[in-house]
Amino acid sequence: MCFLLLCLTLTLAGTGAVPTGPSIEIHSRIIGGWECDKHSQPWQALLTFTRKHNSVCGGVLVHSQWVLTAAHCIGDNYKVLLGLHDRSSEESTVQEARVSARFPHPLYNMTLLNLLLSHKMNLTFFYKTFLGADFSHDLMLLRLDQPVQLTDAVQVLDLPTQEPQVGSTCHVSGWGRTSQNYENSFVLPEKLQCVEFTLLSNNECSHAHMFKVTEAMLCAGHMEGGKDSCVGDSGGPLICDGVFQGIASWGSSPCGQQGRPGIYVKVFLYISWIQETIKAHS
């Protein structure tokens, strides 16, 4: 379920070596999934934008004029597509919008993100700077230039009314990367992909990743590996037992590794911020 990229594989300077531990991707991705039923995810948005290069993320329509995505999907020249299933065909259901304003969560560490995106670094600097780094609050609201028309293929997804439970059955969707093979990193699916897995305890993710896993995050995936979101899926929805609960945020690289589930923003904790931001800027 990935699309172009906002992918971060942390490469080191000098010899071109990489960290001895797993690389980090600040973008979730879809591995081990299947083609979603057409328009079964009518709230799904595809975002294309620029930030040094062309990039892609997912998003969620939470209001007729607002899309929720990940803060690390920040960029310029956004194009938002809704009602899309197959990127390779002209679909009459597609609505295209531009973004008139963007509102990343004020507590998201954009300085740390920019450092991660812009630097080639030696091993010592990498671990000193990013071991235990906190990428909480990875949310951003995008105001569209005009409201979209709600149809069978374009629908608003309701915010959660209660927290998810560990053990819930969840799925995530997107056009992000579908291969764990980095030689195929630019081979992205034309059709919207879905993958299903389980909501795990945060302790399981805390032991699996070098970034900090906080109470503002959700841990989801298969401990056996092989099923995951991937590069290009970031910002897309995590739906657990039929309820919108998370936004795809980050995970290990390559995607879908055994013992390394993905990390999602816990949307329930941000309902007030989402509602207040929309009310203040509509």
From Swiss-Prot:
Signal peptide interval: 1-17
SUPFAM superfamilies: Trypsin-like serine proteases
GO molecular function: serine-type endopeptidase activity; toxin activity
Residues with attached carbohydrate: S100, N109, N122
Location within or outside the cell: Secreted
Keywords: Disulfide bond, Glycoprotein, Hydrolase, Protease, Secreted, Serine protease, Signal, Toxin, Zymogen
InterPro entries noted in UniProt: Peptidase_S1_PA, Peptidase_S1_PA_chymotrypsin, Peptidase_S1A, Trypsin_dom, TRYPSIN_HIS, TRYPSIN_SER
Disulfide bonds: C36-C194, C57-C73, C170-C240, C205-C219, C230-C255
Tissues/organs with expression: Submaxillary and sublingual salivary glands.
Catalytic residues (UniProt): H72 (charge relay system), D138 (charge relay system), S234 (charge relay system)
Its EC number(s): 3.4.21.-
Activity regulation remarks: Strongly inhibited by aprotinin, moderately inhibited by secretory leukoprotease inhibitor, the Kunitz-type soybean trypsin inhibitor, and leupeptin, and not inhibited by urinary trypsin inhibitor or alpha-1 protease inhibitor.
Propeptide: 18-29
pH dependence: Optimum pH is 9.0.
Enzyme class: hydrolase
Major location (coarse): secreted
GO biological process: regulation of systemic arterial blood pressure; zymogen activation
Residue stretches making up the Peptidase S1 domain: 30-279
A GO CC term attached to the entry: secretory granule
Family recorded in the similarity comment: Belongs to the peptidase S1 family. Kallikrein subfamily.
Task of the protein: Has kallikrein-like activity, converts kininogens to kinins, and has dilatory effects on the blood vessel walls. Shows highest activity toward Pro-Phe-Arg-MCA and Boc-Val-Leu-Lys-MCA in vitro. Has preference for Arg and Lys in position P1 and hydrophobic residues in position P2.
Name of this chain's protein: Blarina toxin
